[in-house]
Amino acid sequence: MNKFNFHVGINKHLCIAIKCSNNQIKTIMKFKTKFAISLFTIAMAFTSCNTEDVSESTTEEASLTTNQNVSTSRVGVCSEVPGWASQNGGTTGGGTSAETAVTTYAQLKSAIENTSVKLIKVSGTITVSARISFQNQTGKTIYGTSGAKIVSTNQTKDGSGIIYFKGSKNIIIRNLIFEGPGAYDTDGWDNVTLDNCQNVWVDHCEFRDGVDGNFDIKNKSDYISVTYTKFTYLKAPRAGGSGGSDDHRYSNLIGSSDSATGDRGTLRITFARCWWASGCKERMPRVRFGKVHIINCYFNSSVSNKCIAAGFEANIKVENNVFENVKTPIELMTGLTAVTVTSGNVFTNTSGNTAGKNTAFTPPYSIVTLLASAVKSDISAGAGATFAGNICGSF
């Protein structure tokens, strides 16, 4: 037997490095061909992988211990709910249940009130004749097709509002525009209210021109995530209401009263990649009691008086947001618990306070975090009802 002296690797000069017979050369060349094919197959497998999927896997492993800073958004799966709604067993809504399609107010009201209907598809523009009560239900999704809109034209105290969610759990609201008739301080109703609801995910929606507010959360509601959602006022406010404010473009109230001490330990809410856009005056949001995480959001309402307002026993973490052309990005009110404003926030052409006070809570979840430099472009392009339907995975 001859002894062989192999170089590391196999190349076209393989037989120069070894002494071998013609048969051995044939054997080696067969091996070389198979080896090359194997390498090519492996290389093609790697290049055919979605690079986003690869980075997502790596990021998810790392995010077990820390949030990740990334420059663009990612697409995940429905089971990977971001923020507080991922806790307490998670939020799945109606899952893969059979759809009930609605195009009229009567159909929408019937589907919402029917507890056996778990997945509602809204198409077109539906104008509500009266506010709809969504009460005492579990495991339901309501979503819109492209351009779907639910509208109220009623500015009265008792007749305003679009949908009132009460005592419900495991709910998903996605890709819908909720449009009110314009702000009017009559102590009326919000476009949408969550009252004592748990595990709710509001994703890729737009709330505009609510009478009292755009979207409020109160009364022991808990484990809520609001993602890629836009808040705006496009209609001029109406003055002269019984409530006393001539401009009540107050978008989002968290906790209804300083005296609602039953809210202690609840109102755990994440606002991630949301946009408080043109027309918002105050309450972006205004918080009592809750542990609220505001991350990667964009504030650019030029008519603002104040943006984030930390009220009684509010505990707020403000992380990697962009404030642009607004007044008082952070209002510290009497009796707050803590507001942490991280170094990742960007303030451009703002006036008023930008500092926090005390040390806010640490979220028990990990969430993919955009670099502040990517927030404006990502949110202005993606926030709102920008999907074609019930498409999952904002992050």
Regions found by a protein language model. Give the residues of each.
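Bacterial N-terminal signal peptides that target proteins for export
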Residues: 24-36
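Extracellular beta-rich repeat passengers
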Residues: 286-395
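Right-handed parallel beta-helix
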Residues: 139-148, 169-180, 196-209, 221-243, ...
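Bacterial Sec-dependent N-terminal signal peptides
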Residues: 31-33, 45-73
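Extracellular beta-strand-rich solenoid/capping regions of secreted or surface-exposed proteins
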Residues: 109-116, 126-141, 150-173, 180-198
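Glycine-rich beta-solenoid repeat tracts in large extracellular/virion proteins
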Residues: 132-136, 161-167, 184-185, 190-196, ...
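Bacterial N-terminal signal peptides
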Residues: 38-45
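Acidic Gly/Asp/Thr-rich repetitive segments characteristic of extracellular carbohydrate-active
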Residues: 80-121
